[in-house]
A protein has these predicted regions:
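PAPS-dependent sulfotransferase catalytic core
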Residues: 1-88, 230-236, 242
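Membrane-proximal basic amphipathic "stem/tether" segments
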Residues: 1-16, 100-101, 107-108, 240-259
Length: 259
Protein backbone atom coordinates (compact mmCIF):
# COMPACT_ATOMS: atom_id res chain seq x y z
CA UNK A 1 0.00 0.00 0.00
CA UNK A 2 2.92 2.31 0.75
CA UNK A 3 4.01 2.00 -2.87
CA UNK A 4 0.53 2.97 -4.07
CA UNK A 5 0.43 6.03 -1.80
CA UNK A 6 3.89 7.01 -3.00
CA UNK A 7 2.79 6.86 -6.65
CA UNK A 8 -0.37 8.84 -5.88
CA UNK A 9 1.67 11.55 -4.17
CA UNK A 10 4.41 11.47 -6.83
CA UNK A 11 2.83 10.72 -10.22
CA UNK A 12 5.24 9.70 -12.97
CA UNK A 13 6.92 12.61 -14.75
CA UNK A 14 8.88 12.07 -17.94
CA UNK A 15 11.24 14.05 -20.11
CA UNK A 16 13.24 13.45 -23.26
CA UNK A 17 16.59 14.98 -24.18
CA UNK A 18 16.45 15.66 -27.92
CA UNK A 19 19.85 15.81 -29.56
CA UNK A 20 22.19 14.93 -32.40
CA UNK A 21 25.72 13.50 -32.16
CA UNK A 22 28.44 15.69 -30.61
CA UNK A 23 26.00 18.17 -29.07
CA UNK A 24 27.08 17.59 -25.48
CA UNK A 25 24.16 15.35 -24.58
CA UNK A 26 26.35 12.99 -22.54
CA UNK A 27 27.65 15.92 -20.51
CA UNK A 28 24.05 16.97 -19.84
CA UNK A 29 22.50 13.58 -19.12
CA UNK A 30 25.41 12.46 -16.93
CA UNK A 31 24.91 15.60 -14.86
CA UNK A 32 21.17 15.06 -14.55
CA UNK A 33 21.61 11.42 -13.63
CA UNK A 34 24.21 12.30 -10.97
CA UNK A 35 21.63 14.34 -9.04
CA UNK A 36 19.71 11.10 -8.28
CA UNK A 37 16.53 13.12 -8.79
CA UNK A 38 16.19 13.29 -12.58
CA UNK A 39 15.85 9.71 -13.68
CA UNK A 40 18.62 7.81 -15.46
CA UNK A 41 18.49 9.27 -18.98
CA UNK A 42 20.03 6.98 -21.61
CA UNK A 43 19.23 5.90 -25.17
CA UNK A 44 16.91 3.12 -24.01
CA UNK A 45 15.08 3.10 -27.36
CA UNK A 46 18.03 2.94 -29.73
CA UNK A 47 17.46 -0.50 -31.29
CA UNK A 48 21.05 -1.69 -30.87
CA UNK A 49 20.88 -0.94 -27.12
CA UNK A 50 17.46 -2.51 -26.53
CA UNK A 51 18.79 -6.06 -26.42
CA UNK A 52 21.18 -5.15 -23.62
CA UNK A 53 18.52 -3.43 -21.54
CA UNK A 54 16.08 -6.22 -22.32
CA UNK A 55 18.48 -8.83 -20.95
CA UNK A 56 19.17 -6.69 -17.89
CA UNK A 57 15.46 -6.33 -17.08
CA UNK A 58 14.13 -9.62 -18.50
CA UNK A 59 12.20 -7.77 -21.21
CA UNK A 60 11.83 -8.73 -24.87
CA UNK A 61 11.49 -5.66 -27.11
CA UNK A 62 10.94 -7.80 -30.20
CA UNK A 63 8.13 -9.92 -28.77
CA UNK A 64 6.46 -7.24 -26.63
CA UNK A 65 7.50 -3.68 -27.41
CA UNK A 66 4.80 -2.03 -25.25
CA UNK A 67 6.00 -4.21 -22.36
CA UNK A 68 9.57 -3.13 -23.01
CA UNK A 69 8.63 0.57 -23.09
CA UNK A 70 6.60 0.30 -19.88
CA UNK A 71 9.23 -1.86 -18.21
CA UNK A 72 12.00 0.63 -18.95
CA UNK A 73 9.88 3.54 -17.71
CA UNK A 74 8.96 1.65 -14.54
CA UNK A 75 12.49 0.59 -13.62
CA UNK A 76 14.72 3.43 -14.83
CA UNK A 77 13.11 6.07 -12.62
CA UNK A 78 14.48 7.76 -9.54
CA UNK A 79 12.68 7.58 -6.21
CA UNK A 80 10.69 10.72 -6.99
CA UNK A 81 9.10 8.97 -10.01
CA UNK A 82 11.04 10.86 -12.69
CA UNK A 83 11.91 9.06 -15.92
CA UNK A 84 14.18 10.52 -18.56
CA UNK A 85 15.51 9.24 -21.86
CA UNK A 86 17.53 10.48 -24.81
CA UNK A 87 16.62 10.47 -28.50
CA UNK A 88 18.76 11.20 -31.54
CA UNK A 89 17.05 12.73 -34.56
CA UNK A 90 18.24 10.01 -36.92
CA UNK A 91 15.98 7.36 -35.32
CA UNK A 92 13.13 9.63 -34.18
CA UNK A 93 10.76 8.56 -36.98
CA UNK A 94 11.58 4.88 -36.47
CA UNK A 95 10.80 5.20 -32.76
CA UNK A 96 7.47 6.94 -33.41
CA UNK A 97 6.52 4.28 -35.96
CA UNK A 98 7.33 1.48 -33.54
CA UNK A 99 5.22 3.09 -30.80
CA UNK A 100 2.30 3.58 -33.18
CA UNK A 101 2.49 0.11 -34.71
CA UNK A 102 1.97 -1.52 -31.31
CA UNK A 103 -1.50 0.13 -31.05
CA UNK A 104 -0.83 0.28 -27.30
CA UNK A 105 -0.27 4.04 -27.19
CA UNK A 106 -2.41 5.18 -30.10
CA UNK A 107 -3.27 4.36 -33.68
CA UNK A 108 -2.79 5.79 -37.15
CA UNK A 109 -4.97 8.77 -36.26
CA UNK A 110 -3.07 9.62 -33.06
CA UNK A 111 -0.86 12.68 -33.37
CA UNK A 112 2.80 12.36 -32.39
CA UNK A 113 2.59 14.41 -29.20
CA UNK A 114 -0.36 12.41 -27.87
CA UNK A 115 1.36 9.17 -28.84
CA UNK A 116 4.46 10.11 -26.88
CA UNK A 117 2.55 11.33 -23.84
CA UNK A 118 0.42 8.19 -23.82
CA UNK A 119 3.66 6.23 -23.53
CA UNK A 120 5.43 8.72 -21.26
CA UNK A 121 3.10 10.66 -18.94
CA UNK A 122 3.62 14.41 -18.58
CA UNK A 123 6.44 14.28 -21.12
CA UNK A 124 8.54 17.43 -21.39
CA UNK A 125 11.16 18.21 -24.01
CA UNK A 126 14.76 19.37 -23.56
CA UNK A 127 16.81 20.20 -26.66
CA UNK A 128 20.59 20.49 -26.41
CA UNK A 129 22.49 21.99 -29.32
CA UNK A 130 25.83 23.55 -30.14
CA UNK A 131 26.08 27.16 -31.25
CA UNK A 132 29.42 26.59 -33.00
CA UNK A 133 28.52 24.08 -35.69
CA UNK A 134 32.02 23.81 -37.17
CA UNK A 135 33.49 22.67 -33.86
CA UNK A 136 30.69 20.14 -33.64
CA UNK A 137 31.63 18.86 -37.10
CA UNK A 138 35.30 18.69 -36.10
CA UNK A 139 34.33 16.63 -33.07
CA UNK A 140 32.23 14.29 -35.21
CA UNK A 141 34.99 13.80 -37.79
CA UNK A 142 37.44 13.04 -35.01
CA UNK A 143 35.15 10.54 -33.27
CA UNK A 144 34.40 8.78 -36.56
CA UNK A 145 38.13 8.13 -36.94
CA UNK A 146 38.98 7.21 -33.35
CA UNK A 147 35.75 5.46 -32.35
CA UNK A 148 35.81 7.40 -29.08
CA UNK A 149 32.43 9.10 -28.70
CA UNK A 150 32.43 9.67 -24.97
CA UNK A 151 35.54 10.58 -22.98
CA UNK A 152 35.90 10.17 -19.23
CA UNK A 153 38.85 11.27 -17.14
CA UNK A 154 41.91 9.16 -17.88
CA UNK A 155 40.72 7.83 -21.25
CA UNK A 156 42.86 8.36 -24.33
CA UNK A 157 42.28 8.00 -28.04
CA UNK A 158 43.68 4.71 -29.30
CA UNK A 159 44.73 6.07 -32.67
CA UNK A 160 45.73 9.48 -33.96
CA UNK A 161 42.98 11.17 -36.02
CA UNK A 162 43.95 12.74 -39.34
CA UNK A 163 42.71 16.02 -40.79
CA UNK A 164 40.13 15.34 -43.50
CA UNK A 165 38.45 18.45 -44.90
CA UNK A 166 35.89 16.44 -46.87
CA UNK A 167 34.84 14.43 -43.82
CA UNK A 168 34.57 17.60 -41.75
CA UNK A 169 32.36 19.31 -44.34
CA UNK A 170 30.18 16.20 -44.66
CA UNK A 171 29.82 16.16 -40.86
CA UNK A 172 28.87 19.84 -40.92
CA UNK A 173 26.12 19.32 -43.50
CA UNK A 174 24.83 16.21 -41.73
CA UNK A 175 24.59 18.11 -38.43
CA UNK A 176 22.57 20.83 -40.15
CA UNK A 177 20.26 18.21 -41.64
CA UNK A 178 19.72 16.44 -38.32
CA UNK A 179 19.05 19.69 -36.45
CA UNK A 180 16.48 20.45 -39.12
CA UNK A 181 14.68 17.21 -38.24
CA UNK A 182 14.27 18.37 -34.64
CA UNK A 183 13.12 21.86 -35.62
CA UNK A 184 10.50 20.44 -37.98
CA UNK A 185 9.37 17.98 -35.32
CA UNK A 186 8.92 20.65 -32.63
CA UNK A 187 7.00 22.82 -35.07
CA UNK A 188 4.80 19.91 -36.12
CA UNK A 189 3.79 18.93 -32.58
CA UNK A 190 3.49 22.53 -31.38
CA UNK A 191 6.04 22.28 -28.58
CA UNK A 192 8.70 24.76 -27.56
CA UNK A 193 11.43 22.70 -25.88
CA UNK A 194 13.71 23.95 -23.14
CA UNK A 195 16.87 24.93 -24.98
CA UNK A 196 20.30 24.06 -23.60
CA UNK A 197 23.34 25.48 -25.36
CA UNK A 198 26.42 23.27 -25.13
CA UNK A 199 28.75 26.24 -24.83
CA UNK A 200 26.80 27.58 -21.84
CA UNK A 201 26.74 24.12 -20.26
CA UNK A 202 30.54 24.00 -20.47
CA UNK A 203 30.96 27.55 -19.18
CA UNK A 204 28.58 27.27 -16.23
CA UNK A 205 27.87 23.60 -15.65
CA UNK A 206 26.07 23.75 -12.31
CA UNK A 207 23.84 26.70 -13.21
CA UNK A 208 22.82 25.06 -16.49
CA UNK A 209 22.01 21.72 -14.85
CA UNK A 210 19.95 23.56 -12.25
CA UNK A 211 18.07 25.47 -14.95
CA UNK A 212 17.07 22.17 -16.57
CA UNK A 213 15.95 20.82 -13.19
CA UNK A 214 13.87 23.97 -12.67
CA UNK A 215 12.22 23.49 -16.07
CA UNK A 216 11.43 19.88 -15.14
CA UNK A 217 10.15 21.05 -11.73
CA UNK A 218 12.64 18.87 -9.92
CA UNK A 219 13.98 20.12 -6.60
CA UNK A 220 17.23 19.05 -5.00
CA UNK A 221 17.59 18.50 -1.25
CA UNK A 222 18.47 21.63 0.71
CA UNK A 223 22.17 22.37 0.43
CA UNK A 224 22.75 19.85 -2.37
CA UNK A 225 25.26 20.78 -5.05
CA UNK A 226 25.67 19.60 -8.61
CA UNK A 227 28.89 17.60 -8.81
CA UNK A 228 31.69 18.15 -11.34
CA UNK A 229 31.25 16.78 -14.87
CA UNK A 230 31.89 13.07 -15.41
CA UNK A 231 32.39 13.50 -19.15
CA UNK A 232 35.23 15.75 -20.29
CA UNK A 233 35.46 18.00 -23.33
CA UNK A 234 37.47 16.60 -26.22
CA UNK A 235 38.52 19.94 -27.66
CA UNK A 236 42.30 20.37 -27.62
CA UNK A 237 45.20 21.57 -29.75
CA UNK A 238 44.28 19.11 -32.53
CA UNK A 239 40.78 20.58 -32.71
CA UNK A 240 42.09 24.15 -32.79
CA UNK A 241 44.59 23.30 -35.53
CA UNK A 242 41.91 21.56 -37.58
CA UNK A 243 39.55 24.52 -37.24
CA UNK A 244 42.16 26.99 -38.51
CA UNK A 245 43.14 24.72 -41.39
CA UNK A 246 39.55 24.03 -42.46
CA UNK A 247 38.66 27.73 -42.49
CA UNK A 248 41.79 28.45 -44.53
CA UNK A 249 41.17 25.66 -47.05
CA UNK A 250 37.38 25.98 -47.34
CA UNK A 251 36.46 29.55 -46.37
CA UNK A 252 33.05 29.39 -48.07
CA UNK A 253 31.96 26.16 -46.34
CA UNK A 254 31.21 27.75 -42.98
CA UNK A 255 30.09 31.14 -41.73
CA UNK A 256 30.73 31.81 -38.02
CA UNK A 257 27.88 34.33 -38.08
CA UNK A 258 25.40 31.50 -38.66
CA UNK A 259 27.07 28.87 -36.48
Amino acid sequence: MGGLFHKLRHPRRCYVVCTIPRSGSNLLTDGLRATHRAGMPKQFFLPKFETRYGVELALDPLADYPGYVRGIANTKTTGNEVFGFKLMSWYLDTFLTRLRDTCAFGDAATDDLSLLRNAFPRLRFVHIHRRHKLRQALSTARALQTGLWKVKNGEMEEREPQFDAELIEQSLREAERQEGIWQNFFQRIGVRPFEVEYEKLCHDYEETIRSVLDFLRISLPRGARVGPPVTIRQSDEISRTWEERFLAERPSAYSPATG
